[in-house]
Amino acid sequence: MAIQHFISFGSLCHPARMLQRIHVKKVSYPFDWMFTDEKIIIDVLNDDFNKFMDKSYYGEVAHKFSERTCGHSQYHEDFFFHKNPRNEDDYLYYQRCVSRFKGMLRESGEKLFIMMYSPGSTKHPTDVYKMFEDGSSKEDIISNLKLRGENLNNTLKNFTHNYKLLIVMNFGNNEKQSFEMEHVGNIHYMTLNTLSESTGVTFKDNMDNLFFSGLMCEQYFKN
């Protein structure tokens, strides 16, 4: 069965931008353009988006990118990085996104949720980036990210069905592009080795954008 719903879980904007690039991002969902990690997603799901939509948690960001930014005291200091839900229009945008997301969870069509980590280049999540700084091996970092994917899946399965969870683990500054795929039940782990680093939205070298997009089409659009 063809995948009908493509959903970005973050951890930055890169997955949403990639879905736009391959023309399968038809609608907006809550986590498209923000800072997240699996712990945030788990809490938002378990909390039914209550804190997510609670304006009392909103405040100034730590690193102001534009006027349309907003921090969240529970989740991340730069949580809303391209929207400002303290403004009515952006708040209504997130209301629509949340409603659409909840409706999608109830749909019977196949879903692909994507969580991408590029901690070496984006320094996010900070605890994984600290592993880089402390000299942890690539294998140890991958093991850590796989455990995070497993934890996320253990919560997600309580809210929806007929889905795959893709965990993209990106490592930049390699001499050549390569990838590895591992399927563990409905969790797909992609180790993505690129020439350049992620900016959080795209790769610095467009050859890597083409490589990533091509892999996604090859893995998830086979006839």
Where are these regions (language model features)?
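Extracellular glycan-modifying ectodomains
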Residues: 2-223
